[in-house]
Design a protein with these regions (language model features):
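Sec-dependent N-terminal signal peptides
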Residues: 1-9
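Bacterial Sec-dependent signal peptides at the C-terminal "C-region" and cleavage site
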Residues: 8-27
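Electrostatic cytochrome c docking/interface patches
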Residues: 37-74, 132-136
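Stable alpha-helical elements in mature extracytoplasmic
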Residues: 46, 67, 119, 123, ...
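The canonical Cys-X-X-Cys-His
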Residues: 71, 75-86, 95, 147-151
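Gly/Gly-Pro-rich "capping" loops immediately C-terminal to redox-active cysteine motifs
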Residues: 72, 87-128, 132, 166
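Amphipathic alpha-helical interface segments used for dimerization/assembly
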Residues: 79, 124, 128-131, 145-155
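Flexible coil segments in periplasmic/lumen-exposed cytochrome c-class electron-transfer proteins
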Residues: 136-192
């Protein structure tokens, strides 16, 4: 192992010496091209997809509404491949709180929408921005409202016939809401 480290160190020194020699001792001032030939400027439409924010009080939520029954269909089509048929199985993050935590197949308590997230509006915001994984930001507001309703219902937070919209979503009280506190430190090292 020591020989490998020594060889690596000698190689780095040699590369640095060559680079410095070629540039007259100015290795860190190489002139790079203005563009590396990849990427492009984002369009206004692409920027608008990401330029959103939904606050805990619902400010920023779009018009529309969602139903649990419709969300179940959207979930099956666009989410179950990553999160499992019921939101528990995976292979990616678990979304639904386990209804039988004594099941020996269940891992330790995972952070889910039903036991960790502080605000229901965050569910909408996160789905809208980041899902589905293979095409983030592609869901319509209607699909996101439907998915939000379905996931809140599956976590036991709303009834099957509840309608989720900009007025009702902020009123859903999440079980973990009181576990999150605002950071009120002021430019100092103090810790509460």
């Amino acid at each position: 192992m020591a020989a490998v480290c020594l060889l690596f160190s000698i190689s780095l020194t040699s590369i640095q010496s060559l680079t410095t020699a070629k540039n007259g001792g100015q290795a860190d001032t190489l002139h790079y091209p203005k563009s590396f030939g990849f990427g492009r400027t984002a369009t206004l439409k692409e920027i608008a997809l990401l330029d959103t924010d939904v606050r805990p009080d619902g400010k920023g939520l779009p018009a529309g509404s969602g139903k649990v029954s419709e969300g179940k269909l959207v979930y099956a089509a666009k989410c179950s491949g990553c999160h499992g048929a019921t939101g528990v199985e995976g292979p990616n993050d678990q979304l639904v709180t386990i209804k039988n935590p004594t099941d020996p197949k269940v891992k330790a308590r995972n952070k889910t929408i039903g036991n960790y997230w502080p605000y229901a509006t965050t569910v909408f915001d996160y789905i809208k921005r980041a899902m589905p994984f293979n095409q983030p930001g592609s869901l319509t507001d209607q699909e996101v409202y439907n998915l939000t309703a379905f996931l809140l219902h599956e976590n036991g937070l709303i009834k099957a016939d509840d309608i989720i919209n900009a007025k009702t979503l902020p009123k859903v009280v999440m079980p973990a809401r009181d576990f999150f506190v605002p950071d009120d430190r002021r430019d100092g090292p103090e810790i509460r």
